[in-house]
Regions:
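Noncatalytic partner-interaction/assembly domains of nucleic-acid and motor enzyme complexes
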Residues: 1-109
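Interdomain "pre-motor" coupling segment immediately N-terminal to P-loop NTPase/helicase cores
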Residues: 91-142
């Protein structure tokens, strides 16, 4: 299993972004476990990071106006253009018929990544005989 979403393809990642922007229930469910590092492009990483930060602060998904203001603050013109292009591409998937499937798959992927990280963290704890710590880390990951 790959540590990134590249295995699912380019358009799949764009559908995740559109879900983060338009499906509050999905954003609430996945915001704690989805990481920008799972995405291929720097532009997608920037979008996911920005959506998560906005959600953490305001408890709602960002509006297009809010995103535009954040995009305008990007210092790199290349990244700014890529973010705008990727956002446009993501919006083309707003009405995709497989968004529920994408939700299920990305949630499963993120949960598995979270569990994988917890297991790796548990190895060090096992060497220290910290069994309560291991149980706690695994419980949190589940």
């Amino acid at each position: 299993m790959s540590d990134t979403l590249i295995q699912f393809g380019h358009s799949f990642q764009k559908k995740i972004i559109v879900l983060l922007l338009y499906n509050r229930r999905f954003l609430q469910t996945i915001s704690d476990i989805i990481l920008p590092e799972y995405f291929d492009s720097d532009a997608d990483k920037w979008l996911v990071r920005s959506i998560k930060k906005y959600y953490e602060k305001y408890k709602v998904e960002p509006t297009l106006d809010a995103l535009k203001i954040q995009i305008d603050d990007i210092s790199s013109e290349i990244l700014k253009k890529l973010v705008v292009d990727n956002l446009r591409e993501a919006f083309q998937h707003r009405e995709a018929t497989d968004l529920e499937f994408v939700e299920e798959k990305v949630l499963e992927f993120c949960k598995n990544q979270n569990l994988k990280s917890a297991i790796m963290e548990s190895v060090d704890m096992l060497e220290r005989h910290d069994y309560d710590g291991i149980k706690n880390v695994i419980d949190v990951a589940m």
